């Protein structure tokens, strides 16, 4: 997105930009932090056009606006309008938000405090948005759709051969039924709105004490000098049991935190963070939880294979971590 177009879009919202700071590009969107002529820090987001994205934007913002109105530091709207940009090739949607301070962290920077705060933030978010009336998709349906196409992907004989010859791996074929059963069982549990993407890129940390946000008396997610200053990207929000959210974040932490044991990560995230520091309490079957964690890890493994040449995967730290964890969990076998 060229800077002239970005400025024109900002002008459409009735704002004169004084300085555009940077752009952050993700899978779904491009995010521009800028300061207005009046001195306000704002965030312009361009959303990638894909099936259902407009409804997804509206649903996710409905959830985050509720969380903000109840005192949580989450991304929230500056302007309620959605701008549509079209040309002969594509359609892009743009929306304007308040800017949240803080930074995401590198995977090797995770400490016990970071993980505990993540657990607390998720717990508080769950209790805050529990009664939302937003019409969200079911988390189980989202996962079953994923399950269908990864099953088809790995059923392809040429893919099976490439996995064996280029990656020296075999897939435990029984896991596909096990994953489906875990998703279906979790679907029968009590449900509520979830974030479903509380991973490193969507959590903003600050290493100094923050001023209270306008809706809270004090910073609410803080341990000594470390604070979670914001949660962003609610686009994957869905309805389901909290086990889905916890399993997603735990799986991601397993791959990120090579210097911490799985038991320590579980303790920091769920026992110390979610249950003790947070305002919700998670009680679930550990075997079911582990099944969902393995599913999320396997889905991440699939994405590595789908989007990268197999020959270069052994140079990817997170692929190697995910592969080794899946071998330990008996999902993959070295051949």
Task: Show where each model-derived region lies.
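Active-site acidic catalytic loop and adjacent metal/ATP-binding pocket
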Residues: 27-35, 43-44, 180-244
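ATP-binding glycine-rich phosphate-binding loop
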Residues: 13-35
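A cross-family kinase active-site recognition segment
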Residues: 108-167, 191
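All-alpha amphipathic helical-bundle segments outside canonical DNA-binding/catalytic cores
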Residues: 281-293
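Active-site activation/catalytic loop segments of kinase-like enzymes and analogous catalytic loops
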Residues: 243-279, 294-310
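ATP/Mg2+ or Mg2+-diphosphate-binding catalytic cores
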Residues: 299-335
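A glycine-centered beta->alpha junction motif in the catalytic cores
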Residues: 94-108, 156-159, 294-312
């Amino acid at each position: 997105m060229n800077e002239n177009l970005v400025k024109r879009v900002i002008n459409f919202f009735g704002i004169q930009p004084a300085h555009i700071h940077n752009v952050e590009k993700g899978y779904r969107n491009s995010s521009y932090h800028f300061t207005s002529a009046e001195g306000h820090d704002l965030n312009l987001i361009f959303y990638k056009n894909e099936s259902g994205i407009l409804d997804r934007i509206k649903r996710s913002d409905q959830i985050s606006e509720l969380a903000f109105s109840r005192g949580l530091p989450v991304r929230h709207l500056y302007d309620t309008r959605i701008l549509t940009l079209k040309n002969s090739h594509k359609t892009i949607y743009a929306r304007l938000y308040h800017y949240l301070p803080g930074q995401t962290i590198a995977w090797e920077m995770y400490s016990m405090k970071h993980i505990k705060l993540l657990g607390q933030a998720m717990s508080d978010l769950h209790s805050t948005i529990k009664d939302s009336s937003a019409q969200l998709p079911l988390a189980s349906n989202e996962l079953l759709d994923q399950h269908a196409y990864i099953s088809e992907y790995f059923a392809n004989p040429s893919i099976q051969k490439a996995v064996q010859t280029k990656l020296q791996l075999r897939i435990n074929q029984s896991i596909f039924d096990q994953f489906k059963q875990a998703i279906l069982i979790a679907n029968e549990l009590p449900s509520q709105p979830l974030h479903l993407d509380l991973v490193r890129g969507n959590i903003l940390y600050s290493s100094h004490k923050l001023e209270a946000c306008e809706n809270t008396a004090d910073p609410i997610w803080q341990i000594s000098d470390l604070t979670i200053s914001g949660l962003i990207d609610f686009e994957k929000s869905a309805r389901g049991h909290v086990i889905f959210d916890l399993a997603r974040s735990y799986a991601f932490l397993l791959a990120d935190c090579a210097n911490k044991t799985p038991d320590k990560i579980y303790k920091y995230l769920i026992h110390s963070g979610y249950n003790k520091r947070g305002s919700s309490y998670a009680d679930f079957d550990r075997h079911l939880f582990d099944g969902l964690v393995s599913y999320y890890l396997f889905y991440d493994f699939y994405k590595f294979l789908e989007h990268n040449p197999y020959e270069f995967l052994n140079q990817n730290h997170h692929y190697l971590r995910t592969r080794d964890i899946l071998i330990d969990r008996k999902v993959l076998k070295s051949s």
